[in-house]
A protein has these predicted regions:
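Interfacial "coupling" helices/loops that link adjacent transmembrane helices in transporter permeases
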Residues: 8, 12-18, 350-390, 732, ...
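C-terminal transmembrane helical bundles of large multi-pass transporters
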Residues: 685-687, 703-810, 814, 818-821, ...
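Small-residue-rich transmembrane alpha-helices
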Residues: 353-358, 363-365, 389-421, 432-458, ...
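Juxtamembrane segments of multi-pass membrane proteins
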Residues: 490-621, 625-629, 640, 730
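N-terminal Sec/SRP start-transfer signal
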Residues: 1-32, 385, 474-515, 757, ...
Length: 863
């Protein structure tokens, strides 16, 4: 008996393959979209983590004003938890690689254990006269070409490298330049245009400019566990590094003191000899010789000055631009994945309801016969559950594996444009995600079939064998509007009645098409929201051209001297204190870049702090101006109080005087009085700068750094804008994927509904053909109500899209990034038009099914 039902089920699949595929397709689409987007972040992070582990990307980067020697490296290598340590050289130089113009090249020494190079083409250097070039900056030259260090470099730069002509022997990728972007330099144009790696013996210096460390860590990329390991290890690394550097500094001081002592002894001896010679009446030539010896010793003494105590900088991966951007990119993908698939599963359930209800109504007689033959309700129900369940399971598995492979691959291909990472993303199999997908699929297919089948099987076999009585006709709302109803044609009246005749199909169509439109509205609006962030931040809020960081705090005299010395290129400067602090409220703590500018009356030339038409100025003492994104994450608003703590553990409570619009990074502003009274600081370590004229900002920034040794770095605002624009540009691929999936959703819904309508009205359509209706008229009989429902659904989708977009934006929470949630009229118009286009394409495909209806066969009696 079970074999017979199984055969019947298989025959049913073959005879109604279109319906079977419709359920399979909508499930595959929903699962693929859900699993594919959900696993994309994990796949991206796994690929990035594997690459960084293979290249042994540093955990700590150490820099010192004194440099490092081999003993320093050995001391760190022997420290607890340190697994590898490499000293490294770096120098920027003007180079020529065969082009017409010189460009800024950055030379790195090749390290053995940390930051390993990934060879893409050619080979690695074998001697000091060879180099490899980073693939991200490989333009204008080729393997075999020669890179020449230009004579126009400073003498220190020329002396830094052993050879001034280097042969390019390979192309590499380095984890140091994971993200392709702009890097500033103190020379030339101010922008690094080529990056080269050479053997360590190509450098002449005895001291390394930096040191890279790898330490024992646990946890994945960007995980809290990894961050905890770094936080626990950093004090020990800093202690060992400071001890080693200070010990060498003391050796240098001792050597200088010994030299000074020796020079002083020489001076004293010369003075004694001169005194004796003068008393003895020695000739002038002898006296001059003694004086020359004394002056020489004095010059040596004057030259032997004790250097300032060294400063040590311990940096982590978090300070690496590419590392941070990769984190933000993957987080945005994950946020979007949490929302979109809901529609697909909901529509899948409605498609299954419509399909299985229609199938069981068509097979009432067959069900009645099976009951009369002794088949139990459970056995009969199992036949239909097998039909929907097999379709759902196949669709789920197909969608899962295609989605978890396809979506990460497509998204990765877009991000690969901006990152020096492996060409292929690693495949991630997530059992938990697959089980969730299967559970939801079975609920939407077998669960729905069980609910639909129970009501049908409550009737007796005799009732089921007889045809079901047609539903009693109901007047719709339009029929009650007599003036309008009378003016409709016969076919138009049929269309109106059919629109509201089947409630499940009506809601499936409205939800499916409305969901399609809402998805497109959301995708297009997301694109606009993302793309507008950089322009809003750097054109309407941050108005400065560059930000200069100083090694030592500036006095008022230093600030005046800076402006006087750079008067030709600097139009204005806003001097400030800038430092990272922790801000807490409602049990939540975030890191913030705290700024305390000196208000010299031209604050508006550098910043425009505003929100909802309100302009904000510098806070009063005891107050804080906070950016909107951080305020939202802390759950605070104007008038609330927050706790702020600096790196020296000074803690104070400040009142929020305003919350201003800000989109990139976490920023807050306080007065100089608050800085001094609450944190005991009077530092001026940074300046926001506006340049004169329309000259190249990179050249002007390089000139600033060349002219002032106290400037450690100049950040160009336009470079930051370009980097964020590039980062958000890569999200366009997600917008395209969402639109394509929305089109597929519309097609499946329309195909399924049209297929059912044609099957139900096959005798009506055949009758129309016999009566002489043209093909277009017969097609319109079916498609007219589809078109009406498509328009209704699209209009509903426009409204739904507004709320859907707001919900999606609320889910996108990335630290240091905020977005304005808005939908433009163009978004609505494009979404509506695309939905109608998708519906029209579906109708073109379904015309063939109507044209194949055989009039004579279709008009035969169903009895």
């Amino acid at each position: 008996m079970k074999k017979s039902l199984l055969k019947t089920s298989l025959r049913e699949i073959r005879s109604s393959f279109g319906r079977f595929i419709a359920i399979l397709a909508i499930v595959a689409l929903g699962v693929g979209f859900f699993a594919g987007l959900m696993v994309s972040e994990e796949a991206m992070l796994k690929t990035g983590e594997t690459y960084l582990d293979e290249q042994n990307f540093y955990d700590f980067r150490l820099m010192s004003t004194l440099g490092f020697d081999d003993d320093d490296v050995a001391a760190l290598r022997d420290a607890d938890e340190v697994t590898a340590a490499d000293g490294a050289y770096q120098v920027d130089a003007l180079v020529s690689d065969g082009g017409d113009e010189e460009k800024v090249g950055r030379f790195h020494s090749i390290t053995e254990d940390v930051n390993k190079l990934a060879l893409k083409d050619g080979r690695l250097p074998e001697n000091a006269g060879e180099c490899v070039v980073d693939s991200s900056f490989f333009e204008g030259a080729g393997i075999g070409d020669t890179v020449t260090i230009a004579d126009g470099n400073s003498q220190d730069t020329l002396d830094a490298l052993e050879n001034h002509e280097l042969k390019i022997v390979g192309v590499v990728e380095s984890p140091l330049y994971m993200r392709m972007g702009r890097y500033s330099s103190e020379i030339g144009s101010g922008e690094v245009e080529a990056i080269y790696f050479v053997p360590a013996d190509a450098f002449t210096s005895e001291y390394y400019t930096e040191m890279y460390l790898s330490v024992n860590t646990s946890g994945g990329l960007y995980s809290d566990e990894y961050d905890d390991c770094i936080d626990d290890t950093e004090p020990d690394v800093t202690k060992v590094a400071e001890g080693s550097v200070n010990a060498r500094y003391q050796e240098i001081v001792d050597e200088i003191n010994d030299g000074r002592k020796e020079a002083q002894e020489g001076i004293d001896k010369a003075n004694d000899a001169l005194e004796l010679a003068e008393k003895a009446g020695a000739p002038d030539s002898q006296l001059e010789e003694i004086r020359a010896q004394r002056d020489e010793a004095q010059e040596v003494l004057d030259d032997l000055t004790i250097p300032e105590a060294p400063e040590l900088y311990v940096l982590t991966r978090d300070e690496d631009v590419g590392f941070q951007f990769f984190k933000s990119d993957s987080a945005i993908v994950s946020s979007i994945a949490k929302v979109f698939p809901v529609f697909f599963f909901l529509v899948a359930a409605l498609v299954c309801v419509t399909t299985m209800t229609r199938m069981m109504n068509e097979q009432r007689t067959q069900i009645g016969v099976l009951k009369s033959m002794g088949y139990s309700n459970a056995s009969i129900l199992m036949k239909y559950m097998t039909y929907s369940g097999s379709s759902g399971i196949i669709g789920c598995l197909l969608g899962y594996f295609l989605g978890t492979w396809g979506f990460p691959t497509i998204i990765w291909s877009a991000y690969r444009t901006y990152y020096a990472l492996p060409d292929q993303v690693l495949y991630v199999f997530n059992w938990q995600l697959l089980l969730i997908s299967l559970a939801v699929t079975l609920l939407c297919t077998i669960g729905v079939t069980w609910i639909c089948g129970r009501s049908a099987l409550t009737q007796s076999a005799a009732e089921l064998i007889r045809p079901k009585a047609p539903k009693a006709g109901k007047r719709n709302l339009l029929e009650r509007v007599t003036p309008v109803w009378k003016r409709l044609s016969f076919l138009q009246k049929i269309t109106v009645r059919n629109l509201f005749r089947y409630k499940a199909r009506f809601f499936m169509m409205i939800l499916g098409i409305g969901g399609c439109t809402a998805l497109i509205v959301t995708a297009l609006a997301l694109q606009d929201n993302f793309m507008g962030v950089s322009d809003l931040q750097y054109n309407e809020i941050d108005l400065y051209d560059a930000n200069a960081s100083f090694n030592e705090s500036l006095s008022q005299e230093d600030m005046d001297a800076f402006l006087d010395a750079n008067g030709e290129r600097v139009a204005g400067a806003l001097f400030t204190y800038t430092g990272n602090m922790d801000i807490s409220a409602n049990g939540t703590t975030h890191s913030v870049s705290m700024n305390a500018p000196i208000d010299n009356g031209d604050l508006g030339d550098f910043f425009s702090w505003h929100a909802d038409g309100t302009e904000y100025s510098l806070p009063e003492d005891g107050e804080l101006l906070l950016d909107r994104g951080l305020a939202d994450r802390l759950g605070v608003q104007t008038g609330d109080e927050v706790t702020v703590r600096d790196s020296d553990m000074h803690e104070t409570t400040l009142k929020i005087c305003g919350v201003y619009d800000n989109y990139i990074s976490n920023n807050a502003y306080i007065s100089r009085g608050t800085l001094e009274n609450a944190f005991g600081k009077t530092d001026v370590n940074s300046a926001f700068i506006n340049f004169k004229g329309d000259g190249d900002v990179h050249e002007q920034a390089a000139a600033l750094m060349n002219a002032d040794d106290n400037i450690t770095n100049v950040t160009i605002a336009s470079d930051n804008q370009s980097m964020f624009t590039d980062m958000l540009d890569s999200l366009n691929i997600i917008v395209i994927v969402v639109i394509l999936c929305a089109g597929a959703l519309a097609f499946i819904v329309l195909y399924n509904l049209t297929n059912i309508n044609i099957s139900e009205r096959i005798r009506e359509i055949a009758t129309l053909k016999v009566l002489g209706f043209y093909s277009n008229e017969a097609n319109a009989y079916v498609f007219r109500e589809n078109t009406a429902l498509t328009v209704f659904g699209a209009l509903a989708g426009l409204v739904l899209g507004k709320f859907f977009h707001a919900f999606v934006m609320a889910q996108i929470v990335v630290d240091g990034l905020s977005f304005d949630a808005y939908v433009t009229p163009q978004n609505y118009a494009i979404a509506f038009v695309l939905t109608i286009v998708f519906a029209f394409i579906t109708q073109l495909i379904m015309r063939r099914k109507i044209s194949r209806i055989h009039m004579a066969e279709s008009l035969k009696s169903v009895e």
